[in-house]
Amino acid sequence: MGERAGALAAFAELLVREGDKRGLLGPRELPRLWTRHLLNSTAVSGFVPSGALVADVGSGAGFPGVVLALVRPDVDVVLIEPMARRVQWLLDVADWLALDNVRVARARADELHGELAVDVVTCRAVAALRELVPWVAPLLVDDGELAILKGARAAAEIAEAAAVLHRSGLAPAWVEEVDPVVDGVHLFGEEPARVVRTRRVPRG
């Protein structure tokens, strides 16, 4: 994990240097950059199979997409982001960190329906699950999976999205809690990271 931790540290340095002036992270976020953003973003990595093609929707500053690309060099990640200044940031990061397993698409997820088919969709802090699902479900191949970072309302969002999950061809979703404690230290904060998971039901 040493090499991966070093890669995360390099990304952290870029965020500290550039994040505020590029409007990516406010100064109040910097003290909790590791716990709230970087390490929290690693929670999705255990749900991505080796060799997968991943779409990270609404990548913004790079959470969780850039983090996933750094800690899982065995997968390819498409960073989907509609805002020009954020797209430029993601292109710069991919260049500065020599991320050859990353490509950046300036688009909304729904603009890529029929053009992009992936094994896994990730995202964080984009929209409520009931709004998000119709945008991202069409990007999945059969048996492809959503792995979405959510907060304390994860279970409630699943309940609210039950009908749209079914209409979008997805199996019932569940919450996977990633234990944040390593050697007694809470890596992600006081609560576990919550990942909402579901998969695309094969189309007959």
Where is each model-derived feature located?
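Class I SAM-dependent transferase core
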Residues: 1-55, 71, 85-102
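Residue-level recognition of conserved structural "scaffold" positions that shape functional pockets
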Residues: 30, 65-67, 158
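Conserved beta-strand/loop positions that form the S-adenosyl-L-methionine
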Residues: 57-59
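Conserved SAM-binding loop of SAM-dependent methyltransferases across substrates and taxa
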Residues: 61-74
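Flexible, active-site-adjacent loop/turn segments at secondary-structure boundaries
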Residues: 22-23, 31-32, 61, 124-127
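S-adenosylmethionine
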Residues: 72-204
